[in-house]
Amino acid sequence: MNSTNLGAIPLRARKRARTRIALVEALLNRLAQHSLDEIQVSELAADAEISQATFFNYFPTKADLLTHFIQLWSLQVGALARTVEAEHDSALAAIEALLVSTAEQTAAAPRVMLEIIVHQARNLPGPWPGPIELAERVLFLPDAEDVEDLPDTGLAGIIPELLTKAVQRGELPQDTNVEQLHLAVGSTFFGVPLLVGARHPDAVADLQRRQLQLLWAGARAQETA
């Protein structure tokens, strides 16, 4: 259970957090059927029961709202990775859980992942907005411990640290190139849904798991070569 007392957070911050989360949920619901370009701000505002003017007080554009979702997703999978790492004493197991969990969540709405891929391609390597506020972290992940410490900057805020821990634990060779392996993991995360997600969304999780096993095996093989 989260140790932060939500009641101790100012009411204005809690209202702001609830509105942002409501807008993210509205966006995800519509992305399941429509592209980001097709979705109107007026629709999102109506779904979240706010005015269009209020929407723009929170997010300059729809793209900024999608970026905000990616930040919230980062918190969610970061909490999962932290739990799995502790339970299995394995950073590689945490990476696998992160990818598989995301694939399973998006299997019912593969368009969402495709829109995220398009969004990332359009906007990288742009800077991330400011960090997610504490009230929103607590509301979004009420059962997560130390939610204020979770990274909110996408894969880049999670994977390199886990790969470094895997090297330190001996799960990967000491001479592993973490930067290159991070790129390979990212290619698996985005590439598999792009290639097969629209046609076979239920196959993405297993394919990603297999790709990761190949990556780990390749890294270990370099040590013995």
Cite the ranges covered by each PLM segment:
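C-terminal peripheral helix-coil segments that are non-catalytic and often amphipathic
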Residues: 1-6, 104, 153, 157, ...
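Amphipathic alpha-helical packing segments from all-alpha helical-bundle domains
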Residues: 78, 123-169, 179-183, 194, ...
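Basic, helix-initiating cap at the start of DNA-binding domains
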Residues: 1-47
